[in-house]
């Protein structure tokens, strides 16, 4: 999913209607504060982040959910709100045939009904430190002692040092390929409980078809609670919820934990990804989705087993397919070539040579990854079996895992993977037993899949026999691409610094702020779409015969009682990891939750496109209406007041 000293951003010239930048929360200064206030912000930078005033700023109420999603504290009893799709795996894991929390939703009407979750953690940011000089000193000390070290050792030393000093969780982050190092300190909580989530038909209305589209009509939210020593966390500082709404052009700000961007990537990398690797992965994943979708539509039992896997697969496939289209549409490769024209020629030539050298190898590796490794859901089970220390342990792994799979689906996935794998793998990668099976079945992939499924030990050997050494042997001659990419990033950073261009680092799951306004979208010439969607769209799309557009009958009837916005658009700069982030108004009050981007923004991991990059949000008033009117969860509604 998407300014420090001056008012201009770095990757492309900014139009007046969009403010690019995932700004480091601890680096908000007067220039950026002024720019945000010109947009409408009514807070000071110190009211957004201030490590010396704990529990008194916006950032103190925004948490990371395991560094894969964002959530925010919205009551003084540790109540968290995030996206439903961030809770999807929890709901999937908790569901049983008798209690399907994904399909039916879950609501804890009493405190004792809040469900403890295994392995879930939330992280509160307490402070960010610039440790660039300290990292350099540690590196110099290790070098002087003649010790070999890499980034992992440096990270371990710094994190252990600061964890011991502070008693907090420490996380070292490299920015601009090592130009700067920042260390974030977190307090963590591990007793997290599920409070509520709507049925997936409400939360993800429109499903796969509406993903990355606009307009959308999703009630994409879920509620958790943080417990401390068995009691709800006392959190006097929390975000306030606004029922006042907003208008087009109103200030909007997102604070969260964006996962990864690659805006310092070279033109050579973007060209390689969109021309070589992505077409392979997108085609294979798209066909795998169709296989699974066919069985999910035919059998609810398959949907129950595969919906989580399908959701993850479809989200990535659609995002990367859209990325290829947007890179071409917006001329991102040419844009990057213009930006890098003043960089050292030896770096540019090195990148050109290296990417040309790895094209065939990486295309083959993509086929291997998307068939044998990722193309069959049973592969992780087979890999765990191969690592078991005893036959008994191996058999137990198989018995434990096989119930979560459907033989019909797996055999179809295996057959498709076999056809693509043998159709594109060079002979020196295919193992001898693999080749014997291929010859024995003479291209009858369905029969071969039946044989492998019926003989799990043969399937285990087949999956683990790929000769990775053959890939590695050819790659030895391609040089150190990683080093060249790091040199490129640092050179681009210094080039922009010399030109006075304000820079923010690529997203890396650290807390960031992005600001902008509520805004409409014009995706194509003469095509205008509103900045909000309404219940009318739910009724227009509603189709009880189509799973992605079905809704509970009582919800359809209740819609007559709601006439506010459902979803809305801002031009905030977000990406994956921002899911669940609070969308805040000029006073720092919650007006919605970020949950998606639009398809025109899908090149944003490598390049921000003004006027087209949008953040799709669920309106907090729609959330409150569901809780208060449709569900009747009065204890939570009162807690929010």
What residue spans do the PLM features occupy?
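Sec-dependent N-terminal signal peptides
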Residues: 4-13
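Terminal presequence/propeptide segments associated with secretion/organelle targeting
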Residues: 15-641
